[in-house]
Amino acid sequence: LQHRTFCKLPAEPGPCKASIPAFYYNWAAKKCQLFHYGGCKGNANRFSTIEKCRHACVG
């Protein structure tokens, strides 16, 4: 399985101040982890559930 490049991006909460639980793929740790999304901007390495993260980046 070839990893999608967005799976290598760091967690990006963005500039807004909400605290929305989300998951990102931690490339160094090789697993999906929780972070808090601010609600705007950010990047493609953000998923609403750990299952979606695993499906996209773990395979």
From Swiss-Prot:
By its UniProt entry, which SUPFAM superfamilies does this protein fall under? BPTI-like
* Main subcellular location of this protein, as a coarse class: secreted
Site for Reactive bond for trypsin, residues: 17-18
What the entry lists under Pfam families is as follows: Kunitz_BPTI
The record's InterPro entries line, in alphabetical order, gives:
Kunitz_BPTI, Kunitz_BPTI_sf, Prtase_inh_Kunz-CS, TFPI/VKTCI-like
- On whether Secreted is a keyword of this UniProt record, the answer is yes
Note the superkingdom of the native organism: Eukaryota
Question: Got any disulfides in this one, which pairs?
Answer: 7-57, 16-40, 32-53
Which Gene3D superfamilies does the UniProt entry name for this protein? Answer: Pancreatic trypsin inhibitor Kunitz domain
GO (cellular component) term, any one: extracellular region
Q: Name one GO molecular function term.
A: potassium channel regulator activity
Task: Please verify whether the record's keywords include Transmembrane.
Answer: no
Tissue specificity, in the record's words, reads: Expressed by the venom gland.
Q: Which UniProt keywords apply?
A: Copper, Disulfide bond, Ion channel impairing toxin, Potassium channel impairing toxin, Protease inhibitor, Secreted, Serine protease inhibitor, Toxin, Voltage-gated potassium channel impairing toxin
- Location of the protein in the cell: Secreted
Ranges of residues in domain BPTI/Kunitz inhibitor: 7-57
Role noted for this protein: Serine protease inhibitor that inhibits trypsin. May also inhibit voltage-gated potassium channels (Kv). Binds transition metal ions such as copper and cobalt.
Q: Which family does it belong to?
A: Belongs to the venom Kunitz-type family.
**Record's protein name:** Kunitz-type serine protease inhibitor dendrotoxin E
Q: Which source organism does the UniProt entry give?
A: Dendroaspis polylepis polylepis (Black mamba)
